[in-house]
Swiss-Prot record:
Record domain Peptidase C51: where: 141-265
Chain's role: Has weak lytic activity toward S.aureus cells.
Protein name (database record): Probable autolysin SsaALP
Regions annotated as coiled coil: none
Signal peptide: 1-25
Originating organism: Staphylococcus aureus (strain NCTC 8325 / PS 47)
Keyword rRNA-binding recorded: no
Catalytic activity from the UniProt record: Hydrolyzes the link between N-acetylmuramoyl residues and L-amino acid residues in certain cell-wall glycopeptides
Enzyme Commission code: 3.5.1.28
Domain of life: Bacteria
């Protein structure tokens, strides 16, 4: 899905150790498809504003293949070493991380990471410890696929939704799951209609990986369905619902309320 291009590399299987001087030096990062300034800032333990200042950017837009200078320390991790190829290790999940981010950091695929930890879904929680498999093949870049109804348009767009908003988060979450969507569906309240126009199945029945959409408020809201429970309730992940922009949380929707939402498959 997403891959990182680091200026610091490991040779002959040896781990590359960062000195204090290296940690403060500027690092060159090549933007990958689906990345945003916020996700890059999180990986390098810096801020969006710092990256914008270092690169004289007037807005938050970045494009695949663009090389940017990233100040501050190297990507967040539990140590200051790059994971050694062929060696098993563990990783403690940090707030805001996803399986794709972690897999890219350690050079393994999401499928390998899920298999090593017996995960049946993409849901992980902060402070959860994950085992990193030996000798991974590296993450893969998201590719366009058809929707679940077989008639949806294919997309491999850059995320142009406003960073930190629910739409921005759900766009990235679907890309991580291998089911990319359009970056031109506008505000959340328009998503169901625009998705239907693009050929996606839209109904009131949730499924894992579908997008939950509601229209109240000036912009509406969207969330990602992580799990459908046996009692008919659903677990969703979302951003900018309770704690403001860039804050992701999980929420359970009672079975009695599920049918009041639209679901994009």
């Amino acid at each position: 899905m997403k891959k990182l291009a680091f200026a610091i590399t490991a040779t002959s299987g040896a781990a590359a150790f960062l000195t204090h001087h290296d940690a403060q030096a500027s690092t060159q990062h090549t933007v990958q498809s689906g990345e945003s300034l916020w996700s890059i800032a999180q990986k390098y333990n810096t801020s969006v504003e710092s990256i914008k200042q270092n690169n004289q950017l007037d807005n938050n837009l970045v494009f695949p293949g663009q090389v940017i200078s990233v100040g501050g320390s190297d990507a967040q991790n539990t140590s200051n070493t790059s994971p050694q190829a062929g060696s098993a290790s563990s990783h403690t999940v940090q707030a805001g991380e996803s399986l794709n981010i972690i897999a890219s950091r350690y050079g393994v695929s999401v499928d390998q990471l899920m298999a090593a930890n017996n995960l049946r879904g993409y849901l992980i929680m902060p402070n959860q410890t994950l085992q990193i498999p030996n000798g991974g093949s590296g993450g893969t870049t998201p590719t366009a696929t058809t929707g679940s109804n077989g008639n949806a348009s294919s997309f491999n767009h850059q995320n142009l939704y406003t960073a930190g908003q629910c739409t921005w988060y759900v766009f990235d979450r679907r890309a991580q799951a291998g089911s990319p969507i359009s970056t031109y569906w506008s505000d959340a309240k328009y998503w169901a209609g625009n998705a239907a126009n693009d050929g996606y199945q839209v109904n009131n029945t949730p499924s894992v990986g579908s997008i939950m959409q509601s229209t109240p408020g000036p912009y509406g809201h969207v969330a990602y369905v992580e799990r459908v429970n046996g009692d008919g309730s659903i677990l969703i992940s979302e951003m900018n619902y309770t704690y403001g922009p860039y804050n992701m949380n999980y929420r359970t929707i009672p079975a009695s309320e599920v049918s009041s939402y639209a679901f994009i498959h």
